[in-house]
């Protein structure tokens, strides 16, 4: 059925419909619909629908749909959909979807989706998705995703993800992720990650987390606002203005997790961390400390012995004082005895002495003393001769 000046509907065994001046719906065994000035819906064994001025939905064995001024959805064995002025969705064996003015979703055997003004999702054998004005996701055999104004996720055989205004995740055979306005994660055959506004990860398998963080060297990581990795295999945390807290370091579980000799963490003026042994810094090792403790034990034993001897010596002075009181014999006496007490520096001693007249000119004397503060028992004997 054709309705409109120069409208045409044609095809054997078909129910094609053309509505509008110059509209054309054609194809055998089909039910194509063209609605709008010079709209075109064409293809055998198809149910293509073109709605809008100069719209085009065509392809054999297809269900392509084009809606909008100059919208185009075409391809054999396809289910492509284009919605919006100058929207474009095409590819054989595909189900590409383009939604928005000047949006583009193309590629054979694909399921690419482009949503927004001037968006592009393209690539054969792909599942690329572009969402946001001027977003771009492309690459053959890929699953790239770009979300945000001017976001870009591109590369063949890749699964790159860009999320944020002017974010970029690109590279062949890659799994790069860029999240944040102006974030960039790029490189072929790598898995780089950039998270944060202006974050940049371009070194092989590098990661940058934080606004303005940068990891441009292989296997490097930068974490924190403005953190920058400056060499390969480096892990950078923050900047010189940051402080660091690791609460679990002091836990019993952390201590239990350690094995073997422990070491000290050291740093230089630039904050580069390393570890070293205690002996390397001039500190005593556990073996050294054990040796010192053994020596101290010996010294303490000697000091204890010396202290005991000193105590005896002090008490000995008190014993000497006590012994100094020897008895003397009167002319009529043959035996005399005396008892004395001596003290010195808070120590005490007791003594007992005796004198014996042996003959008219000879006297013998002797005594015993006992120090009560560790001095022990002492004694003396003596003889006096006079004429």
What is each of the regions a protein language model found here?
Residues 3-7, 12-23, 28-40, 44-55, ...:
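Small/polar residue-rich beta-strand/coil "junction" motifs that cap repeat-based extracellular fibers
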């Amino acid at each position: 059925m054709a309705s409109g000046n120069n409208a045409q509907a044609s095809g054997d065994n078909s129910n094609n419909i053309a509505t509008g001046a110059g509209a054309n719906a054609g194809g055998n065994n089909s039910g194509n619909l063209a609605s709008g000035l010079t709209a075109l819906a064409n293809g055998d064994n198809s149910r293509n629908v073109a709605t809008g001025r100069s719209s085009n939905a065509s392809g054999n064995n297809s269900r392509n749909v084009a809606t909008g001024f100059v919208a185009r959805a075409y391809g054999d064995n396809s289910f492509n959909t284009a919605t919006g002025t100058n929207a474009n969705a095409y590819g054989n064996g595909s189900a590409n979807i383009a939604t928005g003015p000047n949006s583009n979703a193309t590629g054979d055997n694909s399921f690419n989706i482009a949503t927004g003004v001037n968006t592009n999702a393209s690539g054969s054998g792909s599942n690329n998705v572009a969402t946001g004005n001027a977003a771009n996701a492309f690459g053959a055999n890929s699953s790239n995703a770009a979300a945000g104004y001017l976001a870009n996720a591109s590369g063949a055989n890749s699964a790159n993800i860009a999320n944020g205004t002017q974010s970029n995740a690109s590279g062949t055979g890659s799994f790069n992720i860029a999240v944040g306005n102006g974030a960039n994660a790029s490189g072929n055959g790598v898995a780089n990650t950039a998270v944060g506004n202006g974050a940049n990860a371009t070194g092989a398998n590098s990661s940058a987390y934080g606004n303005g963080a940068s990891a441009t060297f292989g296997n490097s990581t930068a974490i924190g606002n403005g953190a920058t990795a400056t060499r390969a295999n480096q892990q950078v945390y923050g900047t010189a203005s940051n402080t660091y807290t690791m609460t679990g370091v002091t836990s019993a579980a952390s201590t239990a997790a350690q094995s073997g000799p422990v070491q000290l963490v050291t740093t230089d003026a630039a904050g580069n961390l390393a570890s070293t042994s205690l002996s390397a810094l001039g500190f005593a090792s556990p073996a050294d400390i054990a040796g010192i403790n053994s020596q101290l034990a010996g010294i303490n034993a000697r000091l204890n012995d010396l202290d005991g001897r000193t105590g005896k010596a002090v008490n000995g002075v008190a014993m000497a004082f006590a012994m100094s009181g020897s008895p003397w014999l009167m002319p009529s006496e043959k035996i005399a005895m005396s008892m004395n007490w001596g003290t010195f520096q808070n120590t005490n001693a007791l003594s007992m002495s005796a004198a014996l007249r042996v003959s008219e000119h000879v006297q013998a004397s002797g005594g015993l003393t006992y120090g009560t503060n560790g001095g022990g028992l002492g004694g003396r004997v003596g003889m006096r001769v006079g004429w």
